[in-house]
């Protein structure tokens, strides 16, 4: 160790001895006069001293003046020989290189010394109040005096030497830095420094990007695995619906399949497993079941569970004084048509026997009531006035009796004889009035109910009278 370093170490040890005495003795005595516990109060005293030196300028100046007197007393240097400004220069020169000592002003040295002392006091106070040192300072002080003070001096000297090395490096870096001579060089140096910082940020972001890409790749593999499993389950579910398409429980599953995205049914494997014809058959079956369920719901909501008619056809009241039929059944309608034909043929010179024989020669005209049965608007002709109880099941009367079979000639002749008797009884009470409308052959006017309950006019059969031979056309 050379003479210069020994001089610096002696100054650092003197500095450490002064502040160790303050922390170990002075602050401990102040803690004894307080009402709180010694440990808690000692911690308050250390913290208050550190904050006071940093924030209170007068306390700092008082502390520095006290240290100046202590330094002169320990080094045995006369205060007249070592004034206060030389004292500050001596302390600061021990931390910086000699070549920079003369270039630094006294004010700059004072600010450097203030920063050094504040930093040193803060670190020394933190070290003393640790769990390792605090019990030895508060308890058994006489027994632990040499041990505690030795550890505090070692820490103080180590910290001051470390601080001296940091200041040396700063001054050396400043000496190595050449100030730019022109503005262009200054701008280049500034941009170069900024560029280096950007490159450092780019490296950090690149590494972060790599880690995120690795995480994304892992998540993508998991997603593809889950998607393949989901697609396979959907295909199995759809195949199960195809196998159980005749069961009633397949309808909710079909509705569930319709809500799924179509992308799950567009892969090649599914196209191979399910042919196009089979898909069409399944779709038609599903549509048919949906229509059946819809019709069942409508039927359940209608009164008395009767089907709702789509069209209701009636025969309107003929003009003049012609008798009005009270019921629109097959037997009554046949009677009305026969009565009209009888009057017309009687007027034109034909008899009932000729008409019957004429009707037998043409088998396609045997069923008079079969006119326009293929037209949907006349299929439910008996559904009018469903609220009248005597007309609800009028078609069901005596259908099982063989004597009412309308396809036999005997039934036709019996009906004609019955109608002749009824006509004679009615004519006895009321004379027949010649209706000029019958000259052109009476054609019943037909009206139909639409869904809103209004009448719609329609002419579904025409009867032509061409003179001479009798020709009956039913279209």
Curated annotation (Swiss-Prot):
Keywords of this entry: Coiled coil, Glycoprotein, Host membrane, Late protein, Membrane, Transmembrane, Transmembrane helix
One GO cellular component term: host cell membrane
Membrane topology: Single-pass membrane protein
Subcellular location, record wording: Host membrane
Region (Disordered): 295-324
Transmembrane regions listed in the UniProt entry: 7-28
First and last residue of the signal peptide: none
Coiled-coil annotated spans: 183-233
Induction section of the entry: Expressed in the late phase of the viral replicative cycle.
Biased composition (Polar residues): 295-305
Residues bearing glycans: 73, 83, 195, 450, 460
Family, as annotated: Belongs to the asfivirus B475L family.
Name of the featured protein: Uncharacterized protein B475L
Origin species: African swine fever virus (strain Badajoz 1971 Vero-adapted)
